[in-house]
Amino acid sequence: MSGLQEARLRLARDRSARLMERAVRRMPGGVNSPVRAFRSVGGDPLFMERGEGPRIFDADGNAYIDYVMSYGPLLLGHAPPEVVGAVERAARRGTTFGAPTRLEVELAELVCEAVPSVEVVRMVNSGTEATMSAVRLARGYTGREKILKFDGNYHGHGDALLVSAGSGVATLGLPDSPGVTPGAARDTAVLPYNDLEAVRELFEERGEEFAAVILEPVAGNMGCIPPEEGFLEGLREITAACGALLIFDEVMTGFRVSRGGAQERYGVVPDLTCLGKVIGGGLPVGAYGGRREIMERVAPAGPVYQAGTLSGNPLAMSAGLATLRRTGEPGFYERLEELGARWERGMREAASGSAVPVTVNRVGSMVSLFFASGPVRDFASAAASDAELFKDFFWHMLSRGVYLAPSQYEAGFISLAHSEEEIDRTVEAAAEWFAGRRA
């Protein structure tokens, strides 16, 4: 029996099915973000009603241990009382003013204190806004036009960054979506992630043309893929030598893999940092920041324009402050590391002896399981993993009350609300699936 058949037998799904019928009439594909549509795994999506701690509950009353965690923001789990209380208090005072507030000052101070590269920060409303604005700022600051990104790194849906690699080692101007014009994409170069030598060769030839290199210091949008030893350090050296800015997109890793993000974990300080997800505590938010001399080029201090009606709104700032204050507690990240290590160890043990090829990647509380026989270090090796095996595994886990992202290219997330019990139940469910596929 396939995992999908198991799920259909075990799970009540009538209400979710009826909601999907209504949704497809009024929303493209029935969803407001493509991955939610379950296209990668087949079947229809589940509609969620509520969350509590490490669990979510769908419209039919099924409960799941959640490893999506809204794709990363919910570091404390679902509906933590301190965050809910902060948002309620803020809402009673007013949801938005279109004017500065104390809350945004306090969150800016906290971010600057925690993140090594950030001396000055601008709040926005999404990770896409943050990366678009950081790229514009890099171009305005350097007077150069070209940007280098890496294949499989996702930086939101801005036209200049919605670009993937084609044939050849370095490609320029290949849009990844209809509607992105060649003109919008032609100043973006793409190279394989973790290939420092390719970067070195490109910059030896044309480095003076590049305003910035932007990357996820830990890739999370092709599954969790860590930087190889020396990769981040090499990028720092190469960009500094030619006057290009190094931009870390830490929308996913900021306050997730350590309090100071991946830059603190790996000891490499970029020029600009993009943030989001965790810093909003589950509400829409983004931010970009960096050295004072660069950030002072942003309007109204400087000529590089960026603005937003709801930027720094009290609800998001309140949720962010309540979340980030918890991250400063003794043992916070040590606990997340313990839980992540338990998940990784358990998954390796569950898969041992199976005929199924498995690679497990983890950085802190970011995790991924690939159905691949060798190391997964870039987009090519991630894309070579077995999508059909993932689909069957996904539905089996769902039928056992474990909610994974419905795509093999999404990292999983462990929250502080997870416990050893949830991790062990997850491993047991995985072991059951692997047991049916012994060598």
Swiss-Prot record:
EC numbers for this chain: 5.4.3.8
KW Cell membrane (keyword) present: no
Residue(s) carrying N6-(pyridoxal phosphate)lysine: K277
Compartmental location: Cytoplasm
Xref: CDD domains: OAT_like
Reaction(s) the record says it catalyses: (S)-4-amino-5-oxopentanoate = 5-aminolevulinate
Keywords: Cytoplasm, Isomerase, Porphyrin biosynthesis, Pyridoxal phosphate
Cofactor(s) demanded: pyridoxal 5'-phosphate
BP terms from Gene Ontology: protoporphyrinogen IX biosynthetic process
Any one GO molecular function term: glutamate-1-semialdehyde 2,1-aminomutase activity
Primary location recorded for the protein, binned into one broad class: cytoplasm
One Gene Ontology cellular component annotation held by this UniProt entry: cytoplasm
Pathway linked to the protein: Porphyrin-containing compound metabolism; protoporphyrin-IX biosynthesis; 5-aminolevulinate from L-glutamyl-tRNA(Glu): step 2/2
NCBIfam families documented for this protein: hemL, PRK00062.1
Family, as annotated: Belongs to the class-III pyridoxal-phosphate-dependent aminotransferase family. HemL subfamily.
Subunit structure as annotated in this protein's UniProt entry: Homodimer.
Protein name: Glutamate-1-semialdehyde 2,1-aminomutase
Organism: Rubrobacter xylanophilus (strain DSM 9941 / JCM 11954 / NBRC 16129 / PRD-1)
Annotated gene: hemL
